[in-house]
């Protein structure tokens, strides 16, 4: 075969593969929960708690997925996807994942770092010139004033949320609201993110770069860096570089028409702790099916399923690889899941890496969390975490905004951890004492 013919055949095969519909790739199922060191009886407590929450009208429905050693040990839906329409919650229901988008975008950014196309030490202004001279709202001599930033913001500042950029609440609201910013929501905007990020650069920020941990539009700025470096929209980049290779077939910034019936409804929790259907609009259902598909928020824009997101997190737990597809090196994953901010976040009780909350020491965190765990959550009462020591990935989905007193995301942590009764498959049995007896079993607690 000639070189030209060989190249033509390769191009043809590539086109055929691109035209073929992407098939969902199911994660392997554990033979039993006990086979991977999880108690079936104790996992059943998750089912009970979620069904009780549905019965008491504290949530319409939930999906919980537990992976151990890369195998599905628990995957159950409870309640309704849309109570008013009588649609039952299913394990393939699609959810608005809000800030769980940040991890995906951060991985996308670090892939470009690995390729040598940018550095985390670079000033943001290298890619977004409007960030060359930013300002900060400060209190000086009892008066509030807008002052120049002491230094330029770097890519690392954005990844660690130490750029000083908030969501524009509090004292900054008089600047941000007239400029058209509405917290983290961009789905209904006809402009691309470049226009919004350039506008953001003209507004004062909450803190000087590097001085505080401030949660806000940091990852949205990173998303626009990706767009400017690659020449693609963020949606195109994430689809071609992350979701398609990982076979995350139901993850996107807007729900395709043929999947619209799988999108869960959003509910708001009232003062009495019970739910009502949330209104339309940016703090309710949102325009995730009918929006203009122009602004792709790296900070809060994706929709996904529990299974898709578990595939993404298993890739991270594997050190950047899943089923032969490598997105990152193990060294980069370790860098991303290490604390970069000292005691700036949660007074040191927890740390913050490059896109993830991290646990440095069990017992210091105000909840369950083993050293090395990395996690985050979303505004619609969703959460995820990966525990390298336990070879554990957990994804929990619901759609509450606001969630009010409902705290199922914290409870599911307890419920999963109390079900760990042994090592994952392929790991040695628990250590024995000097008398030859097994060491005391792990106990549960709040």
Segments and roles (model prediction):
Residues 318-322, 331-332, 337-342, 361, ...:
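Short, gly/Ser/Thr-rich active-site loops of penicillin-recognizing serine hydrolases
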Residues 44-51, 64, 70-72, 94-128, ...:
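Active-site SXXK
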Residues 134-371:
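Short, surface-exposed loop or secondary-structure junction motifs
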Residues 1-5:
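N-terminal secretory signal peptides that target proteins for export/translocation
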Residues 28, 32-97, 119, 133-140, ...:
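Short, conserved catalytic-motif segment at the N-terminal edge
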Residues 8-20:
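Bacterial N-terminal signal peptides
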Residues 22-26:
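Boundary at the C-terminal end of the N-terminal hydrophobic targeting segment
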Residues 373, 380-390:
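Short, surface-exposed beta-strand/loop micro-motifs that present aromatic residues
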């Amino acid at each position: 075969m000639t070189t030209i013919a060989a190249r033509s055949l390769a191009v043809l095969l590539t086109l055929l593969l691109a035209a073929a519909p992407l098939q969902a790739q199911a994660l392997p199922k554990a033979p039993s929960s006990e086979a991977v060191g999880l108690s079936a009886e104790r996992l059943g407590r998750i089912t009970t708690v979620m069904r009780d929450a549905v019965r008491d009208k504290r949530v319409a429905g939930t999906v919980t997925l537990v992976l151990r050693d890369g195998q599905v040990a628990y995957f159950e839906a409870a309640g309704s996807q849309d109570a008013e329409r009588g649609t039952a919650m299913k394990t393939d229901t699609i959810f608005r994942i809000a800030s769980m988008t940040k991890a995906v975008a951060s991985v996308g950014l670090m892939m470009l770092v690995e390729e040598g196309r940018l550095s985390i030490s670079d000033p943001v202004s290298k890619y977004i010139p409007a960030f060359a001279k930013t300002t900060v709202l400060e209190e000086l001599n009892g008066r509030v004033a807008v002052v120049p930033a002491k230094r330029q913001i770097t890519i690392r500042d954005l990844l660690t949320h130490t750029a000083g950029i908030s969501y524009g609440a509090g004292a900054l609201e008089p600047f941000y609201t007239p400029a058209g910013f509405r917290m983290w929501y961009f789905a209904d905007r006809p402009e691309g993110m470049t226009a919004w990020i350039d506008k953001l650069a003209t507004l004062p920020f909450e803190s000087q770069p590097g001085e505080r941990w401030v949660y806000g539009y940091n990852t949205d700025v990173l998303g626009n860096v990706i767009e400017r470096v690659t020449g693609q929209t963020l949606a195109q980049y994430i689809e071609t570089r992350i979701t398609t290779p990982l076979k995350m077939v139901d993850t996107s910034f807007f729900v395709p028409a043929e999947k619209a019936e799988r999108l869960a409804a959003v509910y708001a929790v009232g003062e009495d702790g019970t739910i009502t259907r949330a209104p339309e609009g940016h703090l309710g259902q949102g325009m995730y099916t009918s929006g203009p598909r122009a602004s792709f928020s790296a900070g809060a824009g994706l929709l996904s399923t529990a299974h898709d997101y578990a595939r993404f997190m298993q890739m991270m737990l594997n050190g950047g690889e899943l089923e032969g597809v490598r997105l990152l090196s193990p060294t980069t994953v370790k860098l991303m899941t290490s604390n970069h901010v000292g005691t700036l976040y949660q007074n040191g009780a927890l740390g913050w890496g490059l896109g993830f909350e991290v646990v440095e020491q069990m017992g210091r965190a105000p909840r369950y969390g083993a050293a090395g765990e990395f996690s985050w959550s979303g505004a619609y009462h969703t959460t995820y975490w990966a525990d390298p020591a336990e070879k554990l990935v957990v994804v929990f989905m619901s759609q509450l905004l606001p969630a009010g007193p409902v705290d199922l995301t914290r409870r599911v942590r307890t419920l999963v951890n109390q079900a760990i009764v042994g090592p994952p498959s392929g790991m040695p049995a628990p250590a024995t004492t000097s008398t030859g007896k097994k060491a005391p079993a792990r106990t549960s607690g709040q």
